[in-house]
């Protein structure tokens, strides 16, 4: 899910809300291992309205153009795909009626659709709608804001030719009959279900979309999801009501969901306590002062639900900008940064990181965090700086300065690097200006980056941020580094079924990137979400945060 910018998401929330979130570290032990789920003695209850505040406004409910966590999360209430992410972030069959028939070479997947599934306007879903929806992400005329979605869908035969305007259709997306679709891949892709469950591949009605402009459909969406959009006031609120045609029996429990878009973040916590709101759509980072305040108010504990982190933060070291082409200098930077201090600066809502894959991924390598390739060693870092031949030239570090705690974090990193003899100049820019393509044109040496996954698999991180394919013009790599051997390991992994063999190859590829020190891991985000106790069945969804169809209002 691509926020602003996708590779380093952190929406800002002021102090009062941050106080709530600061309780995460103190409460995890008391809430226990099931803290991401709120238990309820009573079963589901039908009816009622749930109101959730979101930090930003929405410009499109079109899944092919939705950018940012808030947009993607709410689109999850309107649409379905061939697969859907379950509460653990694993893809499960959704619009697909049965597991696909997969060819011996693992490049042809044939799906049969559920019959009788209808869009909220009553039209039945057919294979033509599915083919249209996937193809549309690649449409060069649409120019979707989710270019990251386009890059993931360039796995089908003929996808690149279509996306570049050289073909009128995608040869690898084939409709066999009204309920059967065949997808032919360029190469085996073991995690295709993850890609098909992602929001940009949600299914939309071809007849409706082709009859209207993209802008119109973005504010008048038609989907198959548990809810449908009743009304939308830009920058004010979006009201969703139960979809009478929803195909999962007994769902949803709620009659209505209201996404409130204009609440002053500073009063959200107070409004939740008063029962005027039921929760906040996402999370952010507190300061140490916020933590101290929260610990003095234990009454707020019942409103906080911790969640496992889906994001890691790191520094990109631009190998195309001397002296960052010097391995010894990059190694010095990797060993100079005190990650324990960063955790303190971020109020405890971070975990030291020495790798790029987050703990929720099956390819996460625990040994790298226990025995880092480049451990914290400022003395050795200083020696490497001298050995590199560095002569005090300014090194520019770009970062998004819209979040105060990120500013504090970069100041701490700057101090660490200065202590080993590096002349680091911070250049904080606004969220809008912090764009990787623009940064490439400014001769940066380093930038604060990272990745927040669309699904918990290493291919999401590697393919979107680390591969050779994304280090050129228009790509998201700020390091501009290409390791063909690592790419070959990932290609080999993608040809294997999910499991230990595939995971091991991803770990080997990651180790090569880490040894090159083009990406310097800093921390994993420690997250939480604020929820009213009256919300029944709540759990934190690792992709959408809120999965409204499964919640109810306690009476």
Predicted segments — roles?
Residues 47-56, 108-111, 130-133, 181-183, ...:
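Short, well-ordered beta-strand elements
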Residues 53-104, 135, 220-223:
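N-terminal lobe/hinge region of extracytoplasmic solute-binding protein
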Residues 86, 241-245, 307-332, 345, ...:
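A bilobed periplasmic-binding-protein/Venus flytrap-type ligand-binding module shared by bacterial periplasmic
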Residues 98-149, 182, 271, 323:
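Aromatic- and charge-enriched surface segment that lines or borders ligand/interaction sites
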Residues 164-169, 174, 178-179, 184-252, ...:
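Gly/Pro-rich hinge or "lid" segments in bacterial periplasmic/extracellular proteins
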Residues 227, 324, 348-387, 401-408:
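Structural transition elements
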Residues 230-241, 258-321, 407:
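Extracellular/periplasmic solute-recognition and catalytic clefts
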Residues 233, 334-366, 405-414, 435-555:
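Detector for C-terminal structural segments
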């Amino acid at each position: 899910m691509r926020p602003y910018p996708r590779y380093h998401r952190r929406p800002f929330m002021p102090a009062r809300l941050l106080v709530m979130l600061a309780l995460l570290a103190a409460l995890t032990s008391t809430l226990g291992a099931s803290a991401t789920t709120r238990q309820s003695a009573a079963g589901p209850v039908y009816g009622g309205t749930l109101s959730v505040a979101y930090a930003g406004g929405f410009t499109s409910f079109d899944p092919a153009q939705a950018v940012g966590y808030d947009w993607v999360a709410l689109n999850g209430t309107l649409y379905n795909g061939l697969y859907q992410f379950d509460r653990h972030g694993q893809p499960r069959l959704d619009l697909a009626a049965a597991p696909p028939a997969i060819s011996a070479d693992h490049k042809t997947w044939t799906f049969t659709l559920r019959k009788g599934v209808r869009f909220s306007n009553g039209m039945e879903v057919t294979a033509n709608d599915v083919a249209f929806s996937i193809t549309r992400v690649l449409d060069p005329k649409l120019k979707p804001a989710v270019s990251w979605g386009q890059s993931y869908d360039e796995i089908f035969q003929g996808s690149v030719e279509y996306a570049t305007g050289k073909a009128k259709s995608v040869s690898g997306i084939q409709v066999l009959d009204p309920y059967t679709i065949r997808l032919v891949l360029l190469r085996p892709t073991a995690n295709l279900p993850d890609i098909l469950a992602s929001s940009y591949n949600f299914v939309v009605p071809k007849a409706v979309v082709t009859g209207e402009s993209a802008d119109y459909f973005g504010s008048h969406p038609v989907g198959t999801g548990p809810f449908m959009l009743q009304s939308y006031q830009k920058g004010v609120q979006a009201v969703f009501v139960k979809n009478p045609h929803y195909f999962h029996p007994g769902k949803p429990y709620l009659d209505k969901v209201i996404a409130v878009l204009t609440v002053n973040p500073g009063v959200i916590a107070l409004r939740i306590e008063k029962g005027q709101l039921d929760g906040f759509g996402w999370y952010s980072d507190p300061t140490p002062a916020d933590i101290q305040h929260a610990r003095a108010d234990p009454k707020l504990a019942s409103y906080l639900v911790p969640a496992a982190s889906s994001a890691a933060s790191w520094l990109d070291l631009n190998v195309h900008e001397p002296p960052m082409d010097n391995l010894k200098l990059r190694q010095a930077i990797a060993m100079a940064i005190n990650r324990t201090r960063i955790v303190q600066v971020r109020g405890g809502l971070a975990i030291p990181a020495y790798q790029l894959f987050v703990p929720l991924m099956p390819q996460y390598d625990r040994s790298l965090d226990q025995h880092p390739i480049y451990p914290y060693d400022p003395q050795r870092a200083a020696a490497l700086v001298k050995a590199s031949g560095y002569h005090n030239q300014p090194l520019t570090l770009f970062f998004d300065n819209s979040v105060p705690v990120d500013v504090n974090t970069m100041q701490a990193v700057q101090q660490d690097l200065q202590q080993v003899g590096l002349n680091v100049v911070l250049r904080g820019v606004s969220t809008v200006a912090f764009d990787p393509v623009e940064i490439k044109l400014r001769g940066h040496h380093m930038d604060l980056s990272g990745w927040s996954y669309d699904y918990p698999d290493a291919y999401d991180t590697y393919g979107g941020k680390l591969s050779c394919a994304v280090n050129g013009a228009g790509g998201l790599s700020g390091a501009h580094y290409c390791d063909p051997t690592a790419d070959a390991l990932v290609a080999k992994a993608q040809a294997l079924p999910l499991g230990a063999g595939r995971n091991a190859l991803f770990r080997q590829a990651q180790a090569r990137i880490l040894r090159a020190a083009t990406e310097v891991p800093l921390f994993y985000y420690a997250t939480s979400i604020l929820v009213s106790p009256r919300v029944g069945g709540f759990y934190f969804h690792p992709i959408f945060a809120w999965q409204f169809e499964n919640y109810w209002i306690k009476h």
